[in-house]
């Protein structure tokens, strides 16, 4: 149980502002990263009886959010409102555009998940909003519904939210990782080869570790919507065989996120584990830490470039299972937070990264909370992060900063993605030698004065 919880109210220039305190810890900023809700498959295999025309909900077609997915995020939105508005009195009772910012990847299912979630937070007919002021007071407009902007960027260049964004460097790192002894030993094992071989025969196309996820994901969703028909039309499908294929895919997903038993996993002079975590989870982890640093730096500052972050209380990312898992992998808590090992976060999973300031020692702390799926609550995962205390929900912010620095992309991610792996290595080596030489020369010159 949380002890010594109090709600402290203060007055600011723009009206009544509230803050939540847990003992001496004052909540000042929240960042939320969630996965979209239930959806149709994004693609499937050649012999699958359930092709794109089998999926009619959500506008129809591949990768669309279902009514169940919309409901999952409506529920999560209500939970977030209950936490941050009702219980913590941290976010405003009525939507405030300066305090909440939402960024989604540029696909329907994440954008509509964000809309559904915000409907749960600020779109209910609960007298928290005013007709004619917050929404049109006309027939046909849902009572209480306040539309909230959801921002996005081009999906191909969204290196924060979309782990499949165009990034040749990331592809090169994965191809190199596949040549490591650990991955080759796994792929060439008799059990893995047997499953991949059987799926190749069943699916009418070559199946390997790169496209296995398409099959396991399609079958997962088809068990929800077409379970009986699936087993009749695909008579090779059994629960036991699916479990084997899914377990193989879980291990592949660990590899794809830079998680190896061999540490460091060096291939041709490159640590493929670190490089993978840098190029996948590094950007979003560093984006979150950048927001935190700005929030702290701008405290007490009234300059125009601080106005946005000073007002902001909640920054939201609406994204994917791959995004959350890459984020957790960057912090090396993927297996602590998500079960089973290698399994991706479920529909409407969410990470809450909360920033606190201690009113006594004046130091910043963070707390990380995880929502596993619809129907589950919020669980503290802070203690799973290496270096964080095992007897507290709060961790020194420098621990998070150190992880971010360690896993920060070597260049701005847009540039790094277009860098050749081998050339960047050579360039980095030459650059380090050049810098070392300059420092040596400087030291010699300094010795003359």
Swiss-Prot record:
Kindly indicate whether the keyword Transmembrane helix belongs to this entry.
Answer: yes
Highest taxon of the lineage: Eukaryota
Homology family = Belongs to the histidine acid phosphatase family.
Which reaction is catalysed here?
Answer: a phosphate monoester + H2O = an alcohol + phosphate
Q: Per UniProt, what is the name of the gene that codes for the protein in this document?
A: pho-1
Task: State the annotated membrane topology for this chain.
Answer: Single-pass membrane protein; Lipid-anchor; GPI-anchor
The species is: Caenorhabditis elegans
Q: What PANTHER family does the record point to?
A: ACID PHOSPHATASE-RELATED (PTHR11567), INTESTINAL ACID PHOSPHATASE (PTHR11567:SF209)
Q: Would the keyword Signal be found if you checked this record's keyword annotation?
A: yes
Alphabetically, the GO molecular function entries are: acid phosphatase activity; phosphatase activity
Which consequence is recorded for altering residue 70 to I? Maternal effect lethal and loss of phosphatase activity
Q: What role does this protein play?
A: Acid phosphatase required for normal growth and development. Specifically required for normal gut differentiation.
The EC code for this enzyme is: 3.1.3.2
Q: Which GO terms describe its cellular component?
A: membrane raft; side of membrane
What transmembrane ranges does the database entry give? 429-449
Protein name, please? Intestinal acid phosphatase
InterPro entries assigned: Acid_Pase_AS, His_Pase_clade-2, His_PPase_superfam, Histidine_acid_phosphatase
């Amino acid at each position: 149980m949380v002890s010594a919880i109090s709600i402290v109210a203060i007055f600011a220039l723009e009206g009544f502002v509230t803050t939540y305190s847990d003992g001496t810890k004052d909540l000042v900023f929240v960042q939320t990263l969630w996965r979209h809700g239930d959806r149709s498959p994004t693609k499937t295999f050649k012999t699958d009886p359930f092709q794109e025309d089998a999926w009619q909900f959500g506008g129809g077609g591949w990768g669309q959010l279902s009514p169940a997915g919309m409901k999952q995020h409506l529920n999560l939105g209500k939970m977030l409102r209950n936490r941050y508005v009702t219980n913590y009195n941290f976010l405003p009772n009525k939507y405030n555009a300066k305090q909440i910012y939402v960024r989604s990847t540029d696909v329907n299912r994440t954008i509509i998940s964000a809309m559904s979630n915000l409907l749960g937070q600020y779109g209910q007919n609960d007298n928290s909003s005013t007709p004619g002021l917050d929404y049109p007071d006309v027939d046909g407009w849902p009572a209480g519904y306040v539309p909230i902007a959801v921002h996005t960027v081009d999906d191909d260049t969204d290196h924060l939210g979309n782990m499949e964004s165009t990034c040749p460097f990331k592809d090169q790192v994965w191809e190199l990782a596949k040549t490591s002894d650990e991955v080759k030993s796994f792929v060439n094992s008799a059990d893995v080869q047997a499953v991949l071989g059987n799926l190749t025969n069943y699916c009418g196309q070559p199946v390997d570790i790169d496209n296995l996820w398409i099959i396991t994901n399609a079958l997962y969703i088809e068990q929800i919507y077409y379970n009986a028909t699936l087993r009749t039309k695909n008579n090779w499908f059994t629960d036991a065989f699916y479990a084997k294929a899914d377990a193989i895919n879980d291990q592949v997903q660990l590899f794809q996120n830079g998680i190896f038993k061999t540490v460091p996993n060096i291939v041709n002079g490159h640590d493929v584990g670190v490089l993978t975590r840098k190029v996948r989870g590094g950007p979003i982890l560093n984006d979150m830490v950048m927001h935190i640093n700005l929030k702290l730096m701008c405290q007490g500052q009234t300059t125009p470039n601080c106005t946005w972050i000073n007002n902001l209380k909640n920054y939201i990312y609406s994204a994917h299972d791959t995004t959350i898992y890459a984020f957790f992998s960057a912090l090396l808590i993927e297996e602590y937070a998500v079960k089973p090992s290698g399994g991706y976060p479920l529909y409407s999973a969410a990470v809450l990264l909360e920033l606190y300031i201690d009113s006594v020692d004046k130091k910043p702390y963070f707390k990380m909370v995880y929502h596993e799926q619809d129907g589950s609550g919020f669980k503290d995962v802070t203690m799973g992060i290496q270096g964080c205390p095992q007897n507290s929900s709060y961790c020194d912010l420098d621990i998070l900063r150190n992880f971010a620095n360690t896993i920060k992309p070597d260049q701005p991610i847009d540039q790094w993605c277009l860098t050749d792996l081998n050339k960047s290595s050579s360039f980095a080596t030459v650059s380090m030698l050049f810098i070392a030489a300059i420092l040596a020369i400087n030291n010699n010159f300094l010795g003359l004065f």
